[in-house]
Amino acid sequence: MSTNENTKYFDLHTQGLGYLNRIQEVTPKEGTPFLSVTIAALRGSADNAQYTHFECRVSGKQAQELVRQLKQTVEGSSKVLVGFTLSDLYAETFTFKNGDKAGETGISLKARLLRIAWAKVDGQPFYTAQEDV
């Protein structure tokens, strides 16, 4: 006889739109390799937008497939804008090693990329997710 325990989770999801950058396969010394992307998310007024950068582990299957499809496009000169859903956002500190901020502490925002709702390449529609039925 087995006991079935229901584990409960608290989900913290962040939705927005931003540009894809630095797509790479990461192979840690210990652990499982994973796909990584940096999202430069837009915030503020449309005529003076600011950017917040999220370093993301691409977790959702649909997001993994789409990010891999867009890798060469992002590495080229094209701009890829996406509507995204992130989960498990947290901050991590680091020390700048070069440049004007060398020796100073910085903060990196990290999250899991769960889903891409839509994507545009240089302003042209590339992908739109189908709604869950």
Predicted regions and their residues:
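Single-stranded nucleic acid-binding surfaces, predominantly the OB-fold ssDNA-binding core
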Residues: 1-133
